[in-house]
Structure formats: structure tokens, C-alpha cells
Amino acid sequence: MSTVKETIRDDSESELNVWNEKLWSSEIFWRDHYDWLKSNGYLLRPRYHPDWVPSWTGTKRFPLFFEDYGAQFPLFPYNLDAIRVADGKPVMLRLADPPSVSDELKIGRLVSSGDMRSDPRNHCVQIYDTLELPEATSNGRSCIVVMPYLVPWDQVKFQTVGEVVDFCSQVFEGLQFMHSHNIAHNDAKNDNIMMDWSPLYPKPPHSHDTSMRLDWKGASKPRSRTLYPVRYHFIDWDLSKQYNPLIRTNRIPMRLPGYGGDRTVPEFNRKEPCNPFAVDVYCLGNVIREKFIEGAPIFDDYPRRNVGFMRELIADMTHDDPSKRPTMDEVVVRFEEISKTLSWWKLRSRVSDKRFPLLLHRLYSPIHCSVQLSHILRLKRAIPKHTPPKDSALPS
């Protein structure tokens, strides 16, 4: 009986390995442009080389040990990581929407240029470079934008209240910045917030599996946000719009409901015209509500301890009546006032998962306290503050 089971298992593994020796349809574009991208200074992973041969073939090692098997296809068909040949740094490539489809390029270029680029409140992902394709794709996409290599903001656990305060301060400031320029993000959901990988990770993590290093030579080892403060960024402009300031001053711009990835927006359920700026406020508030305050078990998110001080503000941001939600200017002011009331001890308190009993939280507290004492002795701030490195200037 065991021999039959082993034979079935071996056959299924063999079929899976043969299947993974082929590129997925979403990968073909990148393979076909491997040499062109290389000539423009960007190197894709070995899997996308035109003459790629699966590295696990002819070996007895388990295929998942190999990068070109374990990270076998882009998570998003129009995005792929690459290495910038000039300095060896990872970047993200994006096959952008054509202007006839969205304002993605317009908004991306706007927030990456002029005074907006240098504004410290700007948490929009920047465009490093734009590459015009030799020939447009069948759906009209004709250029690739090169952006920083970022990782999901919540991949590393938050250890203290101060780290949560820093995150909220940055994303509130970032959305306030966009709204101050009459830009509605229109999809300010959880996975459109990212963070710079470089402070937290000694080696870049893999875009497909952040638990592994980009070179697949071992596990990635994230560090503490308190010791290595990070900067958070908004991404994804394919639904974003900039409104005429005169129109916004004289009347509220409205759009039809049902856009973006957050389907819990109350106006959407009522199928009524939406104020996109009020929807943005709701969506960002809902990110924080689901990640820290109430949880969202369907997404494996659970409420955290010691974050009740945000409850009233987040409740207002996610109010059913959009006219009763605060503006982002008001959110920023209120959150600054709330933050000032938090003691140094509160800021260094744990934000542990409420799934686990309070007893476990308290049993771990002495360890947490000793770690925080070491941070205090090293003069590390209770609320981390990211300082850009001196060599962080973006290429023109």
C-alpha cells in the first residue's frame, strides 16, 4: 500500500516539476524583453533569460530550494523586480497603463517632479526612470516605469505603540499631501501601502516571498523598526485623479460608487455618488481599523493591545455618513494632539495580538521591558523617525 502511495506522490511531484519548467503567460512579456531591458541597464532574474534552463533539472535537490522554482511567476502581471546594473540595487518595473486607460503616468510623474518631489510630506512612490518600449503591447501599453523596490508595510511585526504611531503619522501625512494637491488616490487600501526595505533588512527580501532573501540564499532577517526606522509609501495610481482646484472649491467632485479594492465603503453599498476624498479617508481609516483595532480574521488580521487611543478618530474616519468624516487636514491635527498625550511608557508598550491570552502577554512583558531598556540606553526614540541616508538622491 505504501509503495502505491509513494508512486502516486512521485508521479504528482514529477508532473508539477514539469509544469513549473514552463513560463506562465504573465511572464512571457518579461522574457521577450530581457535583452532590451538589459541594454537599458536593468537585469531581470535568471528565470526570464531567453535561454533559461530550470536550475533544478538534473539535480536531486528539492526544487523549492531553487529561486527560479520557488518564485516562479510575478504576483502582478505588469510588475516585476529587476537589478539596476549601474549600482546593483533592486528596483521595481511597472508596465504602465496607457493614458487612454488611466491617469497612472500623469499622477506618477506629477508626484515625482518639481516641488512635489522634494516635499517631506510626499509619501508617494517616486519614478526613477521611464523606458519607451520599441513596440506597444497588444493592449496599448508602451512604456515601463522604474520605481523603488518596496515591500508590504505589514510584513514585519510592530513591536511597540510608538512604531504604530509612526506608521499612522506617515500615512496620514501622505494622504493629506495628496489631498492638498487635489489628488484623490481612489484606492487607499492595505496593499497599496508599502515601505522601504533597506532600513529593516540587511539583504533585500524577495518580492514573491519576503521571508526569503532576494538571492534565495537564505531567510530574510528583518530588524526592529525602533532601531531602524522606515519610510512608508503609497503606490498604484491607476484609479487616481487630480481635480481642478476651482471645481473642488465651489462644489464637491463626485464619482460613481464601486471603484477600488475596499468594498466595505458605506456609500458603495447605498449605490450613491461618492466624494472621492471622503472615500479616501474611509479607506485609510479602515486599514488601521482592520489591522490594529478590530481586526479582520478573514485576512488573518487580529486586534492589538494598547491601541485604544486611536479608536475614536478611526471611528470618525470610517463613519457611515461621509459628510461627518474629518478631512485629512483634520485627521493629521487630531492625531498629533492624541500622540502628544501618550507617555513614554505607553509609547514603548507592546502591541501584542489579542488572540493570545493576557497571561501570555504579561509573561512576555519582562523580556519586552528589557529590550525597551536597551533602546532607551541607546537613546533610541520611542516614536521612530526615519532620516533619509545622504546618498538617497534619486537618479534623474
What are these regions (language model features)?
Residues 112, 116-171, 198, 204:
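Conserved structural core of kinase catalytic domains
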Residues 304-320:
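Conserved C-terminal C-lobe helix
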Residues 212-222, 236-273, 278, 285:
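Protein kinase subdomain VIII
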Residues 319-345:
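Terminal C-lobe "cap" of eukaryotic-type protein kinase domains
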Residues 37-134:
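ATP-binding glycine-rich loop module of kinase domains
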